[in-house]
A protein has these predicted regions:
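Catalytic cores of alpha/beta
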Residues: 3-6
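A generic structural signal for alpha->beta connector loops
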Residues: 9-10, 27
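Acidic, His- and aromatic-enriched active-site or binding-groove loops in soluble protein domains
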Residues: 10-19
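Terminal accessory/targeting
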Residues: 19, 23-27, 31-148
Length: 148
């Protein structure tokens, strides 16, 4: 019901997760980087401006609403075969109470992510970065977590 209302009345929507917009992103879940007094110094701003996306071919789950029976979710990301050095990807998530590294396994250009703990109420996030030569790539995902 909410999704249909948004699609009818808006062209784009932004999430509460960091990332770089590219052709693979959902127009109603666009990532953004906050720029404010806490996260707005010039060095960070320059870093953000120079980030590149990490496009993907397929992302599962498509529905990022986490209910009690699927917390933590299983995440699978299939990257394009042209993406270089994808196995050098580093990911961090805020499952549990702290940011840490989830378990990551690759099969060719597919990444399987297993979180260590359940996500807390409200918002769960996964941030992945990849250093490629002298540039950085970034992928961020957001989950909405059901209340207890």
């Amino acid at each position: 019901e909410q999704v249909e209302f948004i699609k009818k009345n808006f062209k784009y929507g932004f999430g509460q997760h960091s990332g770089v917009i590219d052709f693979t992103k959902n127009a109603y879940e666009l990532p953004r980087f906050p720029i404010n007094e806490k996260y707005g110094d010039l060095k960070r701003f320059e870093f953000i401006l120079n980030l590149f996306p990490i496009p993907y071919k397929k992302l599962d789950p498509v529905d990022k609403f986490i209910k009690k029976n699927n917390n933590p979710p299983s995440v699978q990301i299939e990257f394009f075969s042209e993406q270089k050095n994808i196995k050098n990807l580093n990911c961090f998530s805020n499952d549990g109470k702290d940011w840490g590294g989830p378990e990551m396994k690759f099969d060719e250009n597919k990444l399987f992510i297993k979180f260590n703990e359940k996500f807390e109420f409200r918002r769960g996030r996964l941030n992945c970065s990849l250093k490629e030569g002298n540039k950085w790539r970034w992928l961020g995902l957001q989950f909405t977590v059901e209340t207890d």
